[in-house]
């Protein structure tokens, strides 16, 4: 589990819920908040130096993700969000039940609506507002259609929560939801 070391920046120290998982290979600095049952995996860098970073409940930030902020833009990640390997989120807002694909980039001031999917490698430009339940692909990112995979996004978040919780001995049954065999039980 993650232990706070010299991660104070201008008097701000990361705040990690006791039932969150942060891998030891993660770098957190400054005003970073990690919610209950969320997980940050090896190689994540989260620097809340000039603004704050907030990861909601039951979200997972996968290997090698970079989370950063701007003077006028925090990085806010909602509940039940999956941020895929190698993504970059900079001073943006990600609403609940969103899937950010591997290698995607979301730039300063962008807002991703609830239930959306940002495809692997996509680029969401500064100040773009993506409506709820959108599928965004490409560089620059374009909305190609509405999507209705909310259950799949939710299941992915539960899967990550359950896998790390069971492995590390944290109570995994938030709200009675468990993940087994590709479904929520």
Task: List each model region and its residues.
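Residues on the solvent-exposed faces and adjacent turns
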Residues: 30, 42, 48, 63, ...
């Amino acid at each position: 589990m993650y232990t706070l070391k010299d991660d104070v920046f201008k008097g701000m120290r990361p705040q990690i819920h006791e039932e969150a998982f942060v891998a030891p290979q993660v770098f957190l600095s400054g005003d970073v908040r990690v919610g209950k049952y969320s997980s940050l995996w090896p190689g994540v860098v989260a620097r809340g130096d000039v603004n704050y970073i907030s990861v909601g409940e039951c979200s997972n930030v996968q290997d090698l993700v970079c989370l950063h902020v701007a003077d006028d833009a925090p990085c806010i990640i909602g509940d039940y969000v999956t941020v895929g390997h190698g993504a970059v989120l900079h001073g943006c807002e990600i609403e609940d039940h969103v899937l950010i694909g591997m290698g995607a980039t979301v730039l300063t001031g962008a807002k991703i609506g609830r239930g959306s999917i940002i495809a692997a490698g996509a680029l969401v430009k500064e100040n773009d507002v993506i409506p709820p339940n959108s599928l965004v692909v490409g560089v620059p990112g374009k909305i190609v259609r509405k999507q209705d995979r909310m259950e799949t996004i939710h299941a992915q978040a539960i899967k990550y929560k359950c896998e790390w919780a069971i492995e590390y001995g944290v109570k995994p049954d938030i709200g009675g939801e468990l993940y087994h065999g590709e479904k929520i039980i």
